[in-house]
């Protein structure tokens, strides 16, 4: 049996020889100058997002939306069947009352994300990495896997395949099948080498996004646990991003992975095969994929936050108009009933459709129909409503 050994080929490349799994190489495997422009755009967008007004109402709503979306996405990637709305509803429940393993997976992910956020930095530091401790990996897998009816996946315990027992990752539809290391001695040795590589001087000083996504990539290749590797790997990526100030986008990117799931899975195999063939820059495509995802994600967060800010300003103006008697209580309630109806029906309404709603009928009880239409006209005149293609729009 070959002896285990490690050797640094250069400042950023660590070659590991295992007992039974052959050689394993940790490397950057990309050209920075080919992604620098996109990396700069990502960091500029994140920096602007971090500097947005920290209004509690805005932050809380963004946080709730990102939490539900992130957990829905990472759970769906692993085969979860809940919708995003069902996920959001389950997350609002007391975890102590939840009995089903499928639902516990969601609350476990919520607890994991909350634990990661304890290490979050408010200041963006894209080139200032912090050490990643092996204990964090075990803690994240424990949080992800705790209290589930899965005896085959002990929380925080490394995988150790019995003789003849196979572990297969992936499928032909997503770029092929991969068989990760099986021997627990090899898995332990590789995980220790992975952390050594991550924390080495020339890797920890790499752009945080690059370091984070490569931490995720190599963790998945080692595949150290029986189950929960995907969820844990994405949380590790999130942890490293949060350490460097990539707030909210660190987990919101999971939506991008889920939306582009075929490319996400296929790139793991494609990069692995390119490395095996000793091609130049085998990790380039995965890094570019993550950078594109980060940029799209942060721009989406900007849009969501701007929408919430505009809504907050709208509500303030509406309250001021009511207080100064520019609009009546009935007109104020008309707008709120319209907003509720739009939210419940997920579509805009015409004036006639709105008038038929029971809440509006109750609001105008004892009034002639013309009063309703006069109120609508007044609210349009004051720019609290607008009309496009016969449909009522909140705002102008």
How would you label these PLM feature ranges?
Residues 1-396:
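FIC/Doc superfamily catalytic core
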């Amino acid at each position: 049996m070959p002896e285990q050994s490690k050797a640094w080929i250069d400042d950023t490349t660590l070659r590991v020889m295992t007992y039974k799994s052959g050689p394993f190489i940790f490397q950057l495997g990309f050209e920075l100058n080919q992604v620098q422009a996109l990396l700069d755009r990502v960091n500029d967008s994140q920096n602007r997002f971090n500097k947005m007004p920290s209004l509690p109402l805005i932050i809380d709503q963004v946080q709730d939306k990102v939490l539900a979306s992130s957990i829905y996405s990472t759970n769906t990637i692993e085969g979860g069947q809940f919708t995003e709305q069902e996920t959001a509803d389950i997350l609002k429940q007391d975890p102590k009352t939840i009995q089903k393993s499928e639902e516990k997976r969601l609350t476990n992910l919520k607890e994991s994300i909350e634990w990661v956020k304890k290490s979050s930095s408010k200041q963006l530091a894209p080139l200032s990495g912090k050490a990643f401790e092996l204990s964090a990996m075990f803690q994240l897998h424990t949080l992800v896997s705790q209290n589930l009816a899965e005896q085959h996946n002990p929380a925080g315990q490394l995988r150790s395949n019995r003789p003849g027992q196979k572990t297969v990752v992936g499928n032909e539809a997503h770029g092929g099948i991969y068989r990760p290391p099986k021997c627990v001695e090899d898995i332990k040795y590789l995980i220790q080498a992975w952390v050594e590589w991550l924390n080495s001087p020339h890797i920890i000083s790499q752009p945080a996004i690059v370091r984070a996504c490569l931490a995720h990539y190599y963790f998945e290749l080692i595949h150290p646990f029986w189950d929960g590797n995907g969820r844990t790997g994405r949380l590790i990526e999130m942890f490293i991003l949060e350490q460097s100030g990539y707030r909210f986008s660190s987990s919101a990117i999971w939506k991008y992975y889920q939306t582009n799931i075929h490319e996400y899975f296929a790139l793991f195999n494609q990069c692995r095969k390119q490395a095996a063939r000793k091609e130049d820059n085998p990790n380039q495509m995965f890094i570019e994929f993550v950078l594109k995802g980060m940029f799209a994600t942060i721009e989406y967060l900007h849009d969501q936050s701007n929408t919430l800010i505009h809504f907050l300003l709208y509500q303030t103006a509406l309250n001021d108009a009511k207080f100064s008697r520019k609009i009546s209580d009935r007109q104020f309630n008309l707008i709120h009933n319209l907003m509720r109806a739009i939210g419940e029906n997920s579509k805009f309404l015409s004036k006639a459709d709105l008038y038929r709603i029971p809440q509006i009928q109750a609001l105008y009880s004892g009034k002639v129909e013309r009063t309703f239409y006069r109120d609508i006209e007044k609210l349009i005149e004051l720019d609290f409503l607008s009309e496009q293609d016969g449909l009522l729009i909140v705002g102008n």
